[in-house]
């Protein structure tokens, strides 16, 4: 349905319609309110939803107020109130170098996630410090205290020569050393003496390590998870004596770190 003209009230057809100032006009009816000069979309100026030309556009005027004692007092009072409020706000925010952030659901979720990550890291560090440098998978088997260890190590050192397996690796030195031979005036240097370690024997009981272990004393051996322990002899419920097949080292090892094959 075609609208009516805001000036003459007649129907405005699309071919002569001007849409401006929230109203519809005929092109001929869209003129200045004062001088009746026809206007267009480029040279009109609107005031109170009425078109004006540049020359007759209403100018805004300001009312002069006399500087009476009462007005001066109100002006001074307003300035004092502004200064008081400014100082109050300044003192209240003094020393605060942060801006207030709204506690939105997204920020609450991020804060909760950070707290969970901090708790996880704390528990990881706590478990590592409790397990020590030789921690394996899961909970580390508890070691006997130093008093229990010293109670059976002393008699073991006295009986150790009687319990060394016959197949334990020892350092052997060849009984016969090559003699330097001389040919005329030249003397051939003797070959260097080599110290060989005999391979561990395959007899006796065989165990497999289920945890990593670092030797805490000279009479103990170190091994890794998965190493094979051969020539194993049971000392008591907590300790064994055997040879690590991978390294050839022989000594004491905790019984709860290995399992029978």
UniProtKB/Swiss-Prot annotation:
Pfam families: LIM, Nebulin, SH3_9
Post-translational changes noted in the entry: Phosphorylated.
Residues modified as Phosphothreonine: 68, 104
Region (Disordered): 111-186
InterPro entries: Lasp1_SH3, LIM-SH3_domain_protein, Nebulin_repeat, SH3-like_dom_sf, SH3_domain, Znf_LIM
Gene3D superfamilies for the chain: Cysteine Rich Protein (2.10.110.10), SH3 Domains (2.30.30.40)
Molecular-function GO term, any one: actin filament binding
Keyword Cell cycle: no
Subunit structure: Interacts with F-actin. Interacts with ANKRD54. Interacts with KBTBD10.
Protein name (record): LIM and SH3 domain protein 1
Taxonomic placement: Eukaryota, Metazoa, Chordata, Craniata, Vertebrata
